[in-house]
């Protein structure tokens, strides 16, 4: 209801729904067992019904739990699949960045896997032929 009012008021000022960003407020899963499912459903509705972009503090979901990174790394690709368009995360955690990239690949956001390949392809060793180097290593 609140997001719908925001979109309506934004339209009064000529702001298109796709230029509005809504934060559905991620709650800690340790306190509310269905917090993940609630935010996935809300993001789907915000995207399909209101056509707005979404963001969140993604690590809120794991607040108060041990080994938070495991939950966060699983949560982000699921958010992407639900339609989340941005998230506040720590870009210094390589596993988290990899999880985001994987989510983009698996949902077709990274069409042709070009960003994934660019980030993770094995570099050629000195003197290797670009057409044969990796193939030979795979056979070995």
Q: What positions do the PLM features span?
A:
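Terminal or standalone catalytic/regulatory effector modules within metabolic enzymes
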Residues: 124, 129-140
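Catalytic alpha/beta core domains of metabolic enzymes, predominantly
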Residues: 1-128
